[in-house]
Each structure stands twice: as structure tokens, then as C-alpha cells.
């Protein structure tokens, strides 16, 4: 799995998306992907905004979400629930620009034919997704993944007392059953885990980091396939 270093502190998402495009045979410059993915006003992006870019390029996109800030578990209990309508109804009662962007992006995602799933994130599920052979973009809490101090200020300086945890995108590329580790392709380099961009992390830590991504509107997995 090849992944380029992210050019700055806020382009981890497009850099991961670029790696998946390259894996699936789409050759496009990283700068073009960065320009085409919708950013958030405060920097960074959302997994669903990555998915919308992929849908616009002719991919099939599936998001596994664990984000209870946006979704209610009961919406997935029956097959005929209009999730877009539920999201808009929630947006009418809940303020926040980031929330509004997320709602509109998910409505676009569903309208374009994107598939949204809500499941239990278990070892078996994650292993099963990786055994398909295609890489998976994970939106997660990188403070938990790195076991690094929280950060504060415009330069994300370490601040264990006053800081906040951070969201991040990485690509999950494989599983080692002998030591139960996940292969991670990380666009952020250097990082506190390894000197290289490709490293292995125990599956339980990866699962914890994904679920804690709910703190930063992440907590999701994105899988792309080329349309047949």
C-alpha cells in the first residue's frame, strides 16, 4: 500500500483518499484530490465528504458509521427509514455549523447512492472487511491511537491539561492473525508511533480509536469499489 505524506496538518483525509484512488487504478495528482474534496471551515474534512468525492468520480462508496452525534441506532433497525429526512429533522433542532455541513453531506451521499451501515465494531467485523483485500479509510481519534498528549493552539502544541483530542484519517490495509495487529498506512509523518508511514497496531487499540472518533465527528470506516 503506497501513501504519500500529507502536505500539511489538515489534509490527511484527501491524502488517504488519494491512496485509495491509486490502489483502485485511478491516477490523479494528490493536489487535485485536495482541491476537489470539500474542506471544513476550521480545517480538515469529514469521511462523508471524501465519499462524495469518490461517488462523483464513479466509485461505489460504503460508510460504516459509529457516530451517535449524527445518527440514532433506531434509524437502522428497519429498512424503510428515510435517514436523510431524519437527519434534516435533527438539524432543524440542533445548532452548529459543522453539524449542518455533516447533515447536508450525508444527504448528498445517500442521494448519490452511497451505502450507509450501522453495526457493532468488533474484531471479527474489522478482520472480515480487511480480508476482502481492499484498503479501508478509518476516521478515528488519533490521540488515542498515538497515545499522545492532547493538543492546543494554532500549531497543535502538546497540552495534556488544557488540550483537546484530535481526529485523523488513516488507511487500514491488512491483518496479522499471529499477533492480532492491523497494518496502518498513515499520511502523517513523522508520527509518534513509528518512523515510517506503514506500521502495525493491535486491533483492540484500532477499534478503540475508531469508536472514540465520535468526539471529533469521525468514528467511521469508508470502503470504495469501482462501479461494475
Label each PLM-derived region with a short phrase:
Residues 1-71, 76:
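Active-site nucleophile-adjacent alpha helix/oxyanion-hole segment immediately C-terminal to the catalytic cysteine
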Residues 128-137, 141-228:
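Noncatalytic regulatory segments and standalone regulatory/sensor domains
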Residues 45, 49, 121, 167, ...:
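Short, well-structured alpha-helical interface segments that form or flank functional binding sites
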Residues 55-164:
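Predominantly the structural core of cysteine protease catalytic domains
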Residues 28, 118-121, 201:
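Short coil/turn linker and secondary-structure boundary residues
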Residues 29-32, 49, 98, 125, ...:
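Exposed alpha-helical structural elements
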Residues 5-12, 81-83, 162, 180:
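Short, mixed-charge, low-aromatic patches
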Amino acid at each position: 500500500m503506497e501513501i504519500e505524506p500529507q502536505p500539511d496538518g489538515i489534509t490527511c483525509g484527501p491524502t488517504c483518499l488519494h491512496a485509495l484512488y491509486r490502489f483502485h487504478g485511478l491516477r490523479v495528482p494528490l493536489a487535485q484530490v485536495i482541491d476537489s474534496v470539500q474542506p471544513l471551515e476550521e480545517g480538515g474534512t469529514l469521511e462523508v465528504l471524501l465519499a462524495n468525492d469518490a461517488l462523483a468520480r464513479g466509485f461505489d462508496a460504503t460508510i460504516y458509521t459509529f457516530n451517535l452525534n449524527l445518527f440514532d441506532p433506531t434509524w437502522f433497525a428497519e429498512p424503510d427509514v428515510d435517514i436523510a429526512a431524519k437527519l434534516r429533522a435533527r438539524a432543524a433542532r440542533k445548532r452548529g455549523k459543522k453539524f449542518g455541513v455533516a447533515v447536508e453531506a450525508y444527504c448528498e451521499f445517500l442521494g448519490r447512492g452511497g451505502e450507509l451501515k450501522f453495526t457493532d465494531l468488533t474484531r471479527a467485523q474489522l478482520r472480515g472487511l480487511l480480508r476482502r483485500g481492499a484498503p479501508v479509510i478509518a476516521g478515528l481519534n488519533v490521540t488515542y491511537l498515538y497515545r499522545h498528549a492532547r493538543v492546543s493552539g494554532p500549531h497543535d502544541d502538546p497540552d495534556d491539561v488544557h488540550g483537546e483530542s484530535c481526529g485523523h484519517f488513516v488507511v487500514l490495509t491488512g491483518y496479522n492473525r499471529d499477533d492480532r495487529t492491523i497494518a496502518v498506512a498513515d499520511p502523517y509523518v513523522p508520527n509518534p508511533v513509528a518512523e515510517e508511514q506503514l506500521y502495525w497496531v493491535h486491533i483492540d487499540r484500532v477499534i478503540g480509536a475508531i469508536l472514540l472518533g465520535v468526539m471529533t465527528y469521525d468514528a467511521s470506516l469508508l470502503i470504495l469499489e469501482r462501479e461494475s
